[in-house]
């Protein structure tokens, strides 16, 4: 691979969206190629932890996907077929097994469950620093508190990247600007179709049933498709989140340059119907107090999938943006971009 790579971070590593992510990792996706990116990412965590010597905090609890009606049951059947085609180990389990793994669930609301043993959770900060340290081991450099002020292309196709700490002449630019992808793109005259959206999750106080189980019986990650909710254990409580249908676009006219490690004011009215479903299907959550509510922005592409590849009509300018499920997909996205730049095409059709 290429050794002379430089990462420029406008503030500190994890600034923007990474620091407040829930950290769930899974491989199921309606797009099989995205599932491949996710599976690669999860397997990569072991490698970067070993290379960097920095823990990623991976807890492979496994994960199940719950169907409450035949529509979602059929969807899970299709997902299992795709998983088998890709060599992934997903199997249907009984609702009795679901309750054994998560006694908080009321099984009367479900008719089927698909189990994936490699799902789990990671520490977002740990993963970010493990990536950075691993890249450094392999010859890359990264600079924090180095915002890019201008990007100017020379006649030979290379780029002058102007920062407050000095200038860099680069053969190519890869825009992986996250919340600031639009702003970085505009420096080169590129308007990217991505938009930050507000996203909520909450963490409950300790739940007696979880304290009694102990860490060795950690509850798996779970997804309820009809409810559009996801959940996992957090300490002795639970984390409950939703990709809300009534999500609010954030900073349509541009991400503030002084934004970094802030959260947004919760808008519980946007998720109260989702919370009601979660409380109904896991009654213990309704009885538990709420310890924390997180509302933070994530960047989405038009179809919810990452926007990856060379920008048409521009020489030596690439993007890896709109990666809203970064801790599931980032490793695979990085692999795809690296193959595309070095080999001329990626091994996965994106």
Please annotate each region the language model reported.
Residues 36-39, 66-75, 114-137, 143, ...:
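Short beta-strand to alpha-helix junction loop
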Residues 2-19:
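Glycine-rich FAD pyrophosphate-binding loop
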């Amino acid at each position: 691979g290429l050794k002379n790579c430089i990462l420029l971070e406008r503030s500190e590593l994890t600034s923007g969206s990474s620091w407040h992510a829930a950290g769930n990792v899974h491989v199921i996706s309606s797009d099989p190629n995205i599932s491949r990116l996710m599976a690669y990412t999860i397997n990569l965590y072991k490698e970067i932890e070993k290379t960097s010597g920095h823990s990623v905090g991976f807890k492979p609890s496994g994960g199940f996907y719950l169907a409450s009606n035949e529509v979602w049951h059929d969807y899970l059947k299709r997902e299992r077929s795709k998983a088998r085609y890709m060599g992934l180990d997903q199997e249907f389990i009984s609702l009795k097994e679901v309750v054994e793994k998560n006694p908080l669930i009321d099984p009367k609301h479900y008719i089927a469950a698909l189990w994936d043993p490699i799902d789990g959770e990671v520490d977002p900060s740990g993963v970010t620093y493990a990536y950075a340290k691993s890249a450094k081991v392999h010859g890359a450099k990264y600079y924090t508190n180095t915002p890019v002020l201008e990007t100017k292309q020379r006649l030979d196709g290379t780029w002058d990247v102007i920062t407050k700490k000095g200038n860099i002449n680069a053969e190519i630019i890869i825009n992986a600007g996250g919340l600031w992808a639009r702003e970085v793109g505009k420096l080169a005259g590129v308007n990217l179709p991505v938009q930050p959206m507000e996203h909520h999750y909450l963490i409950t106080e300790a739940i007696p049933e979880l304290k009694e189980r102990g860490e060795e019986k950690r509850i798996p990650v779970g997804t309820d498709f009809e409810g559009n909710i996801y959940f996992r254990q957090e300490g002795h409580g639970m984390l409950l989140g939703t990709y809300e249908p009534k999500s609010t676009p954030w900073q349509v006219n541009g991400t503030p340059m002084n934004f970094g490690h802030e959260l947004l004011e919760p808008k519980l009215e946007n998720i109260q119907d989702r919370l009601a479903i979660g409380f109904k299907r896991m009654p213990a959550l309704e009885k538990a107090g709420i310890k924390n509510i997180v509302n933070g922005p994530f960047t989405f592409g038009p179809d919810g999938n990452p926007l990856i590849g060379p920008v048409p009509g521009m020489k030596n300018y690439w993007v890896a943006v709109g990666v809203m499920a970064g801790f599931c997909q980032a490793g695979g996205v990085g692999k795809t971009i690296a193959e595309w730049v070095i080999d001329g095409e990626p091994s996965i059709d994106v």
